[in-house]
Amino acid sequence: MRLVLVGPPGAGKGTQAEFVAAHLAVPKISTGDIFRSNVSQGTPLGVQAKRYMDAGELVPDEVTINMVRDRLAEPDAGEGFLLDGFPRTTPQAAALDKLLVDLGTALDLVLELVVDDDEVIRRLSGRRTCRGCGKVWHVEFDAPSQEGRCDRCGAELFQRDDDKPETIATRLREYADKTAPLVDYYGAQSKLVGIDATGPVEDVTVRAIDALRSYSG
């Protein structure tokens, strides 16, 4: 199965991508992993991407799409894959459709993790990161035994700028402007399936697997 996972920040895409890819026995492919691999190996695309990243600029779609093309052409993706973090915009989605045609295949399904904004803010704003070991705690879901201190190393916990409500609100607006239109794009292709991504991680995984079974069956 060839699958794309979409959803707002804080929806749990990374976690669910791992479980769903393992269930399908296909590689989980994230743009972050692709970028790191190309940059560390010094590929021509990696060199281009690093130039933009070092300048604090966004990597152009053309570079990103070519990296994705190269990754999807590898043997382990021949029988299927799960894309996490790509596409993020409708132009990227159209480019993905085209490159899959060039590879002689097509996307099967787009799984949307549905979470409302209030839940996203609750999840992300509750994160606290250890200044010592980097472990991430949560004031509600995974609180340390001593408030403000890491159980693992005893160092101070702090709230990253990315986890502050005002930053989260900005990220949600960007998602609504750029990524949410993917729902309409893939809905028009009858490839979109949405699941409730609230509740325990295990419950969300069960819903995701059930949705895939319904599609396959």
UniProtKB/Swiss-Prot annotation:
Which InterPro entries does the UniProt record give? Answer: Adenyl_kin_sub (IPR006259), Adenylat/UMP-CMP_kin (IPR000850), Adenylat_kinase_CS (IPR033690), Adenylate_kinase_lid-dom (IPR007862), P-loop_NTPase (IPR027417)
Which residues are recorded as binding ATP?
Answer: G10, A11, G12, K13, G14, T15, R127, G199
Tell me which domain of life the UniProt entry assigns to the organism this sequence originates from: Bacteria
Q: Cite a single Pfam family from the UniProt record.
A: ADK
Q: Which reaction does it catalyse?
A: AMP + ATP = 2 ADP
Keyword check for GTP-binding, yes or no.
no
Give an example GO cellular component term for this record.
cytoplasm
Give the residues the record marks as binding Zn(2+).
C130, C133, C150, C153
**Segment LID: which positions?**
126-163
NMP, as annotated region: 30-59
Q: Which UniProt keywords apply?
A: ATP-binding, Cytoplasm, Kinase, Metal-binding, Nucleotide biosynthesis, Nucleotide-binding, Transferase, Zinc
Which terms does the record give in the GO molecular function aspect?
A: adenylate kinase activity; ATP binding; zinc ion binding
Location in or out of the cell: Cytoplasm
Pathway listed:
Purine metabolism; AMP biosynthesis via salvage pathway; AMP from ADP: step 1/1
Self-association state and partner proteins as the record states: Monomer.
Its UniProt domain note says: Consists of three domains, a large central CORE domain and two small peripheral domains, NMPbind and LID, which undergo movements during catalysis. The LID domain closes over the site of phosphoryl transfer upon ATP binding. Assembling and dissambling the active center during each catalytic cycle provides an effective means to prevent ATP hydrolysis. Some bacteria have evolved a zinc-coordinating structure that stabilizes the LID domain.
Protein function: Catalyzes the reversible transfer of the terminal phosphate group between ATP and AMP. Plays an important role in cellular energy homeostasis and in adenine nucleotide metabolism.
Q: What is this protein called?
A: Adenylate kinase
Q: Which gene encodes it?
A: adk
